[in-house]
Amino acid sequence: MKISFLLLLAIVICSIGWTEAQFTNVSCSASSQCWPVCKKLFGTYRGKCMNSKCRCYS
């Protein structure tokens, strides 16, 4: 029983989709300003403005 719980816990931890964030030095005031920056630098539109800097996700 204990082994099956540990196995289930290991499967859940391994299946979590870790998102890799990539920081930029581009200033922003809204997340929509980061979308073209992220597309140009990393090839994805997934990004948001955090602490007045663009942060892109792959």
UniProtKB/Swiss-Prot annotation:
Modified residues (Pyrrolidone carboxylic acid): 22
Residues annotated as signal peptide: 1-21
Disulfide bonds: 28-49, 34-54, 38-56
Site keyed Aromatic residue of the functional dyad: positions: 57
Site feature: Basic residue of the functional dyad: 48
Cellular component GO terms held in the UniProt record: extracellular region
Subcellular locations according to the entry: Secreted
Domain of life, per lineage: Eukaryota
Gene Ontology terms for molecular function: ion channel inhibitor activity; potassium channel regulator activity; toxin activity
InterPro entries cross-referenced by the UniProt entry: Scorpion_toxin-like_sf, Scorpion_toxinS_K_inh
Gene3D superfamilies hit by this protein: Knottin, scorpion toxin-like
Keywords: Calcium-activated potassium channel impairing toxin, Disulfide bond, Ion channel impairing toxin, Neurotoxin, Potassium channel impairing toxin, Pyrrolidone carboxylic acid, Secreted, Signal, Toxin, Voltage-gated potassium channel impairing toxin
Expression sites by tissue: Expressed by the venom gland.
Pfam families: Toxin_2
UniProt domain comment: Has the structural arrangement of an alpha-helix connected to a beta-sheet by disulfide bonds (CSalpha/beta).
Functional note: Potent blocker of both large-conductance calcium-activated potassium channels (KCa1.1/KCNMA1) and voltage-gated potassium channels (Kv1.3/KCNA3 and ERG1/Kv11.1/KCNH2).
Similarity-based family: Belongs to the short scorpion toxin superfamily. Potassium channel inhibitor family. Alpha-KTx 01 subfamily.
Name by which UniProt lists this protein: Potassium channel toxin alpha-KTx 1.6
Organism (species): Olivierus martensii (Manchurian scorpion)
Upper classification of the organism: Eukaryota, Metazoa, Ecdysozoa, Arthropoda, Chelicerata
